[in-house]
């Protein structure tokens, strides 16, 4: 499926989990904007990601972080998520989650994702 173009029948959820997804969407803001229609007030949006923004997946103009803004200030993805979800979601928790991806029998990739849990407040 296309997380940026979900069918309208998908709504009134208590929880949406977006595991290692946000930095692989072609327009992550579309996905985040749709969460106000998908998650009921009182529900949760949980996002995990190492925030590895790559042009192969997301054009740089759509990145939520990992860039320098037009005033020269670096923007990290957590800040971008916070801006994108305000005022409909309030941060509930923020944790680092380490994980390992096996590439071959002798090569593994150790990565730390950030988990954020956002409470739908309005």
Task: Show which residues each predicted segment covers.
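A short acidic, Gly/Pro-enriched loop at the edge of an enzyme's catalytic core
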Residues: 4-16
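Short N-terminal helix/helix-N-cap motif within the alpha/beta-hydrolase-1
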Residues: 8, 26-30
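A short SAM/SAH-binding and catalytic strip from SAM-dependent methyltransferases
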Residues: 15-27
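A short glycine-rich, Lys/Arg-flanked "PGG" loop and its adjoining helix->strand segment in the class I
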Residues: 29-41
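Conserved beta-strand signature within the Rossmann-like core of class I S-adenosyl-L-methionine
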Residues: 42-50
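Short "lid" loop at the C-terminus of a central beta-strand within the Rossmann-like core
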Residues: 50-57
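Conserved Class I S-adenosyl-L-methionine
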Residues: 58-94
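Core SAM-dependent methyltransferase catalytic element
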Residues: 94-122
């Amino acid at each position: 499926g296309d997380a940026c173009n979900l069918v309208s029948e998908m709504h009134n959820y208590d929880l949406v989990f977006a595991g290692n997804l946000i930095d692989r969407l072609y327009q992550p803001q579309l996905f985040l904007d749709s969460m106000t229609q998908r998650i009921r007030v009182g529900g949760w949006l949980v996002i995990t990601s190492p925030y590895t923004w790559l042009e192969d997946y997301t054009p740089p103009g759509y990145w939520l972080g990992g860039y320098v803004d037009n005033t020269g200030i670096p923007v990290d993805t957590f800040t971008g998520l916070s801006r994108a979800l305000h005022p409909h979601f309030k941060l509930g928790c923020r944790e680092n989650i380490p994980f390992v991806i096996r590439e071959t029998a002798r090569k593994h990739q150790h990565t730390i994702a950030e988990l954020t849990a956002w409470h739908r407040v309005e």
